[in-house]
């Protein structure tokens, strides 16, 4: 059959046995990829520093998804939080990877079996003997089973009734761990950042799915609806399935990019909006202010800021800073973070505290401008020194570090002050190792950015696929010129309009 590449799937259009076979093979490929990718990531993952070199800095993609569902231990003897363990149990990272690979192999064998034994009795209509599927009944079965799985996940896995729970953290991504979650049945369950909504929504959606599945198993669709929506056509199934997938892809692209309880920043990295809004900076200043109110010194107050919190407040961890087509992990970009140098506080010769204006997300370069507490520009690094009025040299700017590795160190020479002012544009200042991975200094995106871009792109493609296949199945008679409900035997070429004896073709 000389089919073009874009029409090869027509070979399984009227062959339910082999249609099932190719779908099982597809599942084998998906599960095989997931298991293999997990093993690859585990081979290259360095768990030694969960604070400054977490999974998202290393470009891990499947490890965060396993972790958010409750997997934290490795057969290598390490724990995702940085500790060591002696008894990881079967459901470690490697155990999950192995389960996917074994499942993939079983699906591979099942696909071959169904390809060879395609002509099963279950696929044929007992009245006509032709291949036929009761699609509304199959829909009911699948909806019931999906509802059961959804309910079970929410009621048992997430709640810890029979399972580990899910990854839960505080709003600043500091205390994350796997723990059971109680369902949130009030209005708070609709807050995308409340983990309890994950449990309650799965329980509610699962219950609805079970009831809807039973409904579709026990009630047949009306004839007019069945014919109007072409429920007997397998391409209707394809169209509606694509709709479900693209809708889900758009939703998860949103929850990933804007953040939610299901995409913790400890596993996927911070969102760009946390940089844009100064989210971590405000919390750091709040903590320092609270420390100063308790009569702590600047040095003491800044030394109590967790390194993890300071690291989030660095533009290199903003997923929108990496170009879409810059391959590699964040560590391959600006390097592996080694330590926090501390918070620089700039002052002019009159003793005013100055603040460096931070670089907005979508700038590659940005002028170095220092403002006072009222937002008045007091110093800058000028483009043309001949016309400068606020240069570091003229204003006499000095810098002193509080907290971190340079705690208590101050600099007054203009070259060093300007160096740290430039670095302060990018948030908190960190020492970065660019030698180990030969990092090129160009920012990369985090798995949060890749996931969003991939799912938004495929959702758009699948949206068009839904329109395409939906219109094909709804207007099949128009496209083919054949009434799908035509029962009488017709002779091709005998009539101007197929099957219409009033327009018999004129013999020339």
UniProtKB/Swiss-Prot annotation:
- Any single Gene Ontology cellular-component annotation: photosystem II
The protein's GO terms of the molecular function aspect are: chlorophyll binding; electron transporter, transferring electrons within the cyclic electron transport pathway of photosynthesis activity
Q: How is the cofactor bound?
A: Binds multiple chlorophylls. PSII binds additional chlorophylls, carotenoids and specific lipids.
Q: Enumerate the subcellular locations listed in this protein's record, separating them with semicolons.
A: Plastid, Chloroplast thylakoid membrane
BP term (GO), one? photosynthetic electron transport in photosystem II
Can you name this protein? Photosystem II CP47 reaction center protein
Q: Which gene encodes it?
A: psbB
Q: What does this protein do?
A: One of the components of the core complex of photosystem II (PSII). It binds chlorophyll and helps catalyze the primary light-induced photochemical processes of PSII. PSII is a light-driven water:plastoquinone oxidoreductase, using light energy to abstract electrons from H(2)O, generating O(2) and a proton gradient subsequently used for ATP formation.
Stated membrane topology is: Multi-pass membrane protein
Organism for this UniProt entry: Lotus japonicus
